[in-house]
């Protein structure tokens, strides 16, 4: 589950993820994408990283720190001032198979999309 908490100057992102594949280094790229659906194998309609300011990677609004998995589970809590909750409702949050290298354009060589969720207001 990924939850977002609006603050005056940005958003707290809290992720608690279970069932991640075991990998050698345990890092998984974690991004908000511009698309609005998780339908289809490999989630082909999630679009690119959320990037309304047309920044280069890793400065996209949707670029988040990587998840670090321990035996298939990861927990992360981070603050960002790159977006407000209203801007991400209906967008997708993606976990990739590989860590983000923070250099390769346009998406950090993050590998396949292995998990997807549509961001909704509760």
What kind of region is each of these model predictions?
Residues 1-122:
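N-terminal leader/targeting pre-sequences
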